[in-house]
Curated annotation (Swiss-Prot):
GO terms for biological process: translation. Belongs to the bacterial ribosomal protein bL31 family. Type A subfamily. Binds the 23S rRNA. GO terms for cellular component: ribonucleoprotein complex; ribosome. Keywords: Ribonucleoprotein, Ribosomal protein, RNA-binding, rRNA-binding. This is Large ribosomal subunit protein bL31. It comes from Rickettsia typhi (strain ATCC VR-144 / Wilmington). NCBIfam families: L31 (TIGR00105). The gene is rpmE. GO terms for molecular function: rRNA binding; structural constituent of ribosome.
């Protein structure tokens, strides 16, 4: 391998709440602070289903607000 063309492979700390996970990476910063705990995501945790309901409510509100908007490109030209 050529010298000087590969990124530096170093220790990376991933902070989730009060937990710290250590791994190796080529990430330029040595630390990542997670805003959302992946262990509490509704896809893996059935107890936090209200997050999905809130998301569905937001989508429903959006659809109500923009129900008349159409991006259909199959309209006939006059």
């Amino acid at each position: 391998m050529k010298n000087g063309i590969h990124p530096e492979y170093k220790k990376l700390l991933i902070k989730v709440g009060s937990n710290i996970f250590e791994t190796m990476s080529t990430h330029p910063i040595g630390e990542i602070l997670m805003d959302v705990d992946f262990r509490k995501h509704p896809a893996w945790n059935k107890d936090s289903g209200n997050v999905v309901n809130q998301s569905n409510k937001s989508v429903s509100d959006f659809n109500k607000r923009f129900s008349g908007l159409s991006f259909d490109s199959k309209k006939e030209a006059s």
